[in-house]
């Protein structure tokens, strides 16, 4: 296909995003590919940024990362001493209503990333976003464990 005919083909389906396949041809992107591309952009914007100055970017990132999952995931966002993002890590996966979280593993992960501060994250695929007593207890347990190694918990979302 010539560049001229390629351009007319593209304009005829301008409502779709296109991706290049392994043969070099363009085809409409699958929804999962669009989400992956958006996630890569948001991860790039989030990494190395001032975490607390862009709460909307964090919400957008987490909505794309966790919003469509049918099971609970517990993740952490590692921050440096200036609260810039070091890394986002999904640590534990569970069922639709529960995911086991092991404080020892969270502490090990924080030390491995040389984390100064951390944001704790988990989704609620059941639709109930209010923190349960178990969530509140877990937050306190993790705060206590992480404080022993000088890692400050910024938030639990």
How would you label these PLM feature ranges?
Residues 2-35, 57-60, 82, 92-157:
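Active-site-proximal loop/helix of nucleotide/amide-processing enzymes and allied scaffolds
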Residues 29-91:
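Long amphipathic N-terminal alpha/beta scaffold segment
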